[in-house]
Amino acid sequence: MSLQKCQEEWSEIEKEFQQLQETHKVYKQKLEELNSLQNLCSSCINKHKRRLTEFKGNLHGLKRTSNLEEKELVQQIDGTIKERRNAFFDMEAYLPKKNGLYLNLVLGNVNVTLLSTQAKFAYKDEYEKFKLYLTIILLLGAITCRFVLNYRVTDEVFNFLLVWYYCTLTIRESILISNGSRIKGWWVSHHYVSTFLSGVMLTWPDGLMYQIFRNQFLAFSIFQSCVQFLQYYYQSGCLYRLRALGERNHLDLTVEGFQSWMWRGLTFLLPFLFFGHFWQLYNAITLFGLSRHDACKEWQVFVLALTFLLLFLGNFLTTLKVVHTKFQKNKLKKP
């Protein structure tokens, strides 16, 4: 290449760089405008929320002294206020917000809000794939530990994988909640409890008590992974159909339990879920019995018994509540 050609090419590169600088300058300006607009929206939403709260208090004061026609109007306005809160929730999903305590402890004060619907859905889809792949890996790990490798080291690797899996799920779910996912209640707390349980299992030293409970725990892990795989497979298909019909949010997630939207074609999962819940109770009873054994010296036995009992109560009562609510609604629909 001649020097003249090099100079010509360098001139073109210089022009490209100047254009790039101009484009980046415009980008920074737009970014500042976006930040200002985000702050304005957040401020307006908070102001409107306060006004609605004050208005609702005044509205309930009028309700006590109003006649029948006025009460109907008050109820109508009250229903609109509830819908407005759902609208605020959707708006705030696209605005930066302060992280909760857990995300602050893990990530610090980092903005985790994804600005586009496409980015939110992609992150949610990646979360679902992560759950599926790790469920399969945990299933294979539990089968290997139960039937092939009877070593404490391999058990520790399996338990460490469980701790890492549930820790990662809690972080990802917290990010999804910050971005507008409506997963809440016990199905969020459930993973924190499972993280704690897996951590205690990891610290349980090898001994007579551990060996007595080992096979029962691994068999439970195999069953639980199989049920979770079934849930993912059928729930993801059901959610896809409901989203296509506009009946579910695009950030709704598959869960390890049973929710009201699953009545359409997923009731066959209920026997498996209840069996798994009662297996958790059986684990708790077994561990309570072991904790009273003369040879039991480990604190992990009693703590694990309490944790399995907590998981049983949370899972069983939450599932039972969903089933009971559905039956009550069906009764009201009947003439």
From Swiss-Prot:
GO CC aspect terms: nuclear inner membrane
One Pfam family per UniProt: TMEM120A-B
Membrane topology qualifier: Multi-pass membrane protein
Subcellular location: Nucleus inner membrane
Transmembrane segments annotated in the record for this chain: 100-122, 130-150, 157-177, 193-213, 268-288, 300-320
Keyword Hydrolase among UniProt keywords: no
Domain of life from the UniProt record: Eukaryota
Keyword set includes NADP: no
Keywords, in A-Z order: Coiled coil, Membrane, Nucleus, Transmembrane, Transmembrane helix
Coiled-coil residue spans: 1-40
Entry's Gene Ontology BP terms: fat cell differentiation
Function: Necessary for efficient adipogenesis. Does not show ion channel activity.
Similarity comment text for this entry: Belongs to the TMEM120 family.
Name assigned to this protein: Transmembrane protein 120B-A
